[in-house]
Amino acid sequence: MSELVTVARPYAKAAFDFAVEHQAVAHWQAMLTFCAEVSRNERIAELLSGAVVPEKLAETFIAVCGEELDAAGQNLIRVMAENGRLTVLPDVLEQFTLWRAAQEATVEVDVISASTLKEEQLAKISAAMEQRLSRKVKLNCKIDKSVVAGVVIRAGDMVIDGSVRGRLERLADVLQS
């Protein structure tokens, strides 16, 4: 089993890097899932383990997959067939899925302030958000003079408004009620 993972890893890594670069991780996971299912089919598995010429094997596999594979996916299948590795497609999918999960463990956090924050301030915000979210964070810093002072932090649907503007708005709401 570990030998198959070792064989599958470079293909999965290449596919994942390509997918990230082209912002198509979900699309690639869907393609790999489909290909892994096709490779598990009894008749296809017999074909993969037989003595078929790699070019013919690749074209047959691509034909079976039909429009589920884009041009880049077809290229991956051709390379894997040429190297006799189509049988490890389920392991390629498994490795790809692990890299996707690791990538998605990072949360993008928007930090909006009235002026540029110092490195120490950014480090404290980053550490606090990592602890609060239990995930790694990537800070996207933006400057908005209307904040007046303080910061507004957004991570997904969570907003922490520590700005003077936010405090004034809350004070105005209290006074009007």
From Swiss-Prot:
It comes from the Bacteria. Pfam families: OSCP (PF00213). Its main location: membrane. The keyword Plastid does not apply. Gene3D superfamilies: N-terminal domain of the delta subunit of the F1F0-ATP synthase. It is found in: Cell inner membrane. It is a peripheral membrane protein. Keywords: ATP synthesis, Cell inner membrane, Cell membrane, CF(1), Hydrogen ion transport, Ion transport, Membrane, Transport. One of its GO terms (cellular component) is proton-transporting ATP synthase complex. Coiled coil: none annotated. One of its GO terms (molecular function) is proton-transporting ATP synthase activity, rotational mechanism. PANTHER family: ATP SYNTHASE DELTA CHAIN. Belongs to the ATPase delta chain family. F(1)F(0) ATP synthase produces ATP from ADP in the presence of a proton or sodium gradient. F-type ATPases consist of two structural domains, F(1) containing the extramembraneous catalytic core and F(0) containing the membrane proton channel, linked together by a central stalk and a peripheral stalk. During catalysis, ATP synthesis in the catalytic domain of F(1) is coupled via a rotary mechanism of the central stalk subunits to proton translocation. This protein is part of the stalk that links CF(0) to CF(1). It either transmits conformational changes from CF(0) to CF(1) or is implicated in proton conduction. F-type ATPases have 2 components, F(1) - the catalytic core - and F(0) - the membrane proton channel. F(1) has five subunits: alpha(3), beta(3), gamma(1), delta(1), epsilon(1). F(0) has three main subunits: a(1), b(2) and c(10-14). The alpha and beta chains form an alternating ring which encloses part of the gamma chain. F(1) is attached to F(0) by a central stalk formed by the gamma and epsilon chains, while a peripheral stalk is formed by the delta and b chains. This is ATP synthase subunit delta.
